[in-house]
Amino acid sequence: MELNKNYLTEEGLKQLEAELEHLIQVKRPAIIKLLQEARDQGDLSENADYDAAKAQQGEIETRIAEIQDILANVKLINESQTKKANKVTLGSTVEIYDYSSKTHEKYTIVGALEANPEEHRISNESPLAHAIYGRLVDDECDVVGIEVPYRVKIVKIINW
């Protein structure tokens, strides 16, 4: 994995591009209109509408800059390479057995921007992903870098 890259699935990339387009094409023009309307009210020193619109404009511009920075450093998770892999890699869905809790869990390894623990989508930067990355079915490893380390076994690898 390359450092300083934002790993995204094709779906994640499309979502970010759509958000950026919406911010630039819809939200930015709307806030500019609100600012103009607030300016037309006169004295800006005590104009709450102007202050609120200015704050909202700052949030929009910050998010636009964030997305542009993400897209400038994006690396797509290559679906065709993931399919061919027989080991855990970005995009893999992995079934593990946790020896400490005696449970089976499935996780998909995605870039940090798409991680969602509730959906069992874990960041490639997480301790679990670090422990299992590059490993094969039946490999056992220790998950460290957390308060209570634990041992897991890779039961199954599903590469899209």
From Swiss-Prot:
The lineage of its organism: Bacteria, Bacillati, Mycoplasmatota, Mycoplasmoidales, Mycoplasmoidaceae. Belongs to the GreA/GreB family. The keyword Transcription regulation applies. GO terms for biological process: DNA-templated transcription elongation; regulation of DNA-templated transcription elongation. It comes from the Bacteria. This is Transcription elongation factor GreA. Residues 8-28 form a coiled coil. Pfam families: GreA_GreB, GreA_GreB_N. HAMAP family: GreA_GreB. Necessary for efficient RNA polymerase transcription elongation past template-encoded arresting sites. The arresting sites in DNA have the property of trapping a certain fraction of elongating RNA polymerases that pass through, resulting in locked ternary complexes. Cleavage of the nascent transcript by cleavage factors such as GreA or GreB allows the resumption of elongation from the new 3'terminus. GreA releases sequences of 2 to 3 nucleotides. The keyword Zinc-finger does not apply. One of its GO terms (molecular function) is RNA polymerase binding. InterPro entries: GreA/GreB_C_sf, TF_GreA/GreB_CS, Tscrpt_elong_fac_GreA, Tscrpt_elong_fac_GreA/B, Tscrpt_elong_fac_GreA/B_C, Tscrpt_elong_fac_GreA/B_fam, Tscrpt_elong_fac_GreA/B_N, Tscrpt_elong_fac_GreA/B_N_sf. Disulfide bonds: none annotated. Keywords: Coiled coil, DNA-binding, Transcription, Transcription regulation.
